[in-house]
Curated annotation (Swiss-Prot):
Cited Gene3D superfamilies: Ankyrin repeat-containing domain
Residues spanning the membrane: none
Name this polypeptide is given: Putative ankyrin repeat protein L86
Organism in which the protein naturally occurs: Acanthamoeba polyphaga mimivirus (APMV)
Segments annotated as ANK repeats: 68-101, 118-147, 159-188, 192-223, 227-260, 264-300, 304-337, 341-373, 377-408, 412-446, 448-480
Length: 576
């Protein structure tokens, strides 16, 4: 027998319980009863009457199970559209076939029929109709519509939602409605805690119509699975699906709670930020509006201390990030909420050099946020200004103008200027250093007694000399021991030279003072010349008559009084 025909009963000309026979379109095994063999050959032999005769004589075969646990009823139910007939299904039920016996995979005849409808795209209209009639017949004869297999999956959701996916795709709610009309519990959960509604929202592109249907059958919109995830969370997680916005609105209007938290503390709104579907930014924005409109609390934190505002700060798309943050702030999000590290959303924005932030956006944010909040390490937002960011000089300037404290100290006593001198490496950072120096107290020291200048000295980048120069020009002083570092040696030499020059200048000034004191003493020749000249110019002959000219005439070499006057005038012309 070829592989192509291995599931075709036509190739099996005689019965043997040890032979392998097909029992459905993709299954085959041994240990068939003669009744099972006759069922798969019914349409070939036109053998319904043969089955009746055999069953009358062999009723003990009615619930016999083959090697895979399938009964004659299971085989007849799933092949009633192509190998046997629905009349045979009814015949078996009338003769005591048990519709609730499970096969070795934990599936009953009804579950197998419903599962066959997942291949609805492969079926013709009459085949689909036949399966629906078979399902209804099994229910009429006591099939348990709430039966759960070994994985806890019920008839409706045991295929992990694929049943519903196919049914919805082909606009066929008939089997779902049949089950619900016959008291199927829509809130039964499987071993993972997922209900029918969970599976719908996980596996389907469109959920609106099935949600509307289930709302008529007391479905629990807030049912949680073992991870405490709700249906609303899954819809938000897969918000990129085309109709999820409408489905979310439908759930919220009918009482879905947006503030339930899963085992990690995440709410439905937080799931909007788990994946970055940039092309669906409008969907995300509209869903956030809906959730807030129906009472979502934007300030709930998950187990990691993250709120939706903190999550929004990680959105990569700048336009989307800005608009969502603005919307959240306008609608009650706490601007100063912090994560477990004490970081605010503004700190997270500023510290990432990839985030482009305009002055307009920062001015808007500063209406709400306190920039002087410190994280768990004692840092304020200025400590997080990054290196090499295009926007950071403008952002830094605006923050400094907004009275953000430039002298705030972290847990190691370091100021923003100290950290900047330590970590900045780009020539673009020199502008930021200048700004921080302008607003900061540069003489502050950390817990180890280090100043910003010390941090600049230990910076090994190309801008070290610029930073050191800026600090020295601002008035800082270099006070370290000579090291092997050439710059340290140079600065120390400059410092020692500066000290020597200061001492030299002091010495010269003292020499000048003492020299003037000596030159201008009353008994000096210089003083006497100036005194006599002053008397002559002012015609004070009385004082002049009292002067002793002998020493002066001898010093100047004058022969008489008139000659003395001439020599005095000549000497005065050369005095400074």
């Amino acid at each position: 027998m070829s592989e192509k025909n291995s599931f075709n009963p036509e190739g099996f000309s005689y019965y043997d319980c040890n032979r392998i026979f097909p029992y459905c379109h993709n299954g085959k095994c041994k240990n068939f009863s003669k009744l099972m063999y006759l069922i798969i050959k019914e349409r070939i032999y036109n053998g319904h009457s043969i089955i009746i005769d055999h069953l009358n004589q062999n009723k003990n075969e009615i619930n016999h199970q083959n090697e895979h646990g399938w009964t004659a009823l299971m085989i007849a139910s799933v092949t009633s559209s192509y190998w046997c007939t629905i009349d045979t299904v009814k015949l078996l039920l009338e003769n005591g076939a048990d519709p609730n016996i499970p096969n070795y995979k934990g599936e009953t005849a009804l579950g197998l029929v419903v599962g066959s409808l997942t291949r609805i795209n492969c079926l013709e209209i009459n085949q689909r109709t036949n399966f629906l009639k078979t399902a209804q017949l099994l229910i009429e004869y006591g099939a348990n519509v709430n039966f759960q297999n070994d994985f806890g999956d019920s008839i409706l959701n045991h295929s992990g939602g694929f049943i519903l996916n196919s049914s919805l795709q082909y606009n066929n709610f008939d089997i779902i409605k049949i089950l619900l009309d016959n008291n199927t519990n829509p809130n039964i959960s499987n071993n993972k805690g997922n209900t029918l509604l969970h599976n719908i929202c996980i596996y389907n592109q469109s959920c609106d119509d099935i949600i509307k249907l289930l709302l008529n059958y007391n479905v629990d919109l807030n049912s949680i699975n073992l991870k405490r995830k709700t249906v609303l969370m899954y819809l938000c997680k897969f918000y990129n699906k085309t109709n999820n916005v409408n489905s979310i609105k439908l759930l919220l209007k009918n009482g879905a709670n947006p503030n339930i938290q899963n085992t990690k503390g995440n709410t439905a709104m937080m799931y909007l930020f788990n994946k970055f579907y940039h092309e669906y930014g409008d969907n995300k924005y509209n869903i956030i509006k809906l959730l807030l409109q129906y009472g979502a609390n934007p300030n709930i934190k998950n187990n990691s201390g993250i709120s939706v505002l903190l999550r929004a700060s990680t959105i990569q798309n700048g336009w989307e990030r800005k608009n969502i943050i603005k919307f959240l702030l306008k609608h009650g999000a706490d601007p100063n909420i912090t994560n477990n590290q004490g970081l605010t959303f503004l700190m997270l924005l500023v510290k990432n050099p990839q985030n482009h932030m305009t002055k307009e956006f920062l001015n808007f944010v500063l209406k709400y946020v306190d920039p002087n909040i410190k994280c768990n390490k004692g840092k304020n937002i200025l400590h997080y200004i990054p290196s090499e960011s295009i926007d950071s000089p403008d952002i830094l300037k605006r923050l400094l103008e907004f009275t953000t404290n430039p002298n705030a100290r972290d847990y190691k006593g370091r100021t923003p200027l100290m950290l900047a001198c330590k970590k900045f490496t780009s020539t673009n950072d020199i502008v930021k250093i200048n700004l921080l120096v302008e607003y900061s107290v540069i003489s502050l020291t950390d817990n180890n007694g280090k100043k910003a200048l010390d941090y600049a000295m230990n910076n090994t980048s190309n801008i070290r000399l610029f930073m050191v120069s800026i600090l020295l020009e601002k008035g800082d002083t270099f006070d370290v021991n000579i090291k092997n570092d050439p710059l340290s040696k140079c600065l120390n030499f400059v410092k020692q030279s500066s000290i020597a020059k200061q001492k030299y200048d002091i010495m010269l000034s003292k020499i000048n003072i003492e020299a003037n004191k000596f030159i201008l003493r009353p008994s000096s020749i210089r003083t006497k010349i100036l005194t006599v000249n002053w008397y002559i110019e002012h015609h004070n002959f009385e004082k002049l008559a009292l002067c002793d000219y002998s020493q002066l005439m001898e010093y100047l070499g004058a022969t008489d009084i008139d000659d003395l006057k001439l020599r005095i005038m000549e000497n005065i012309n050369y005095m400074d």
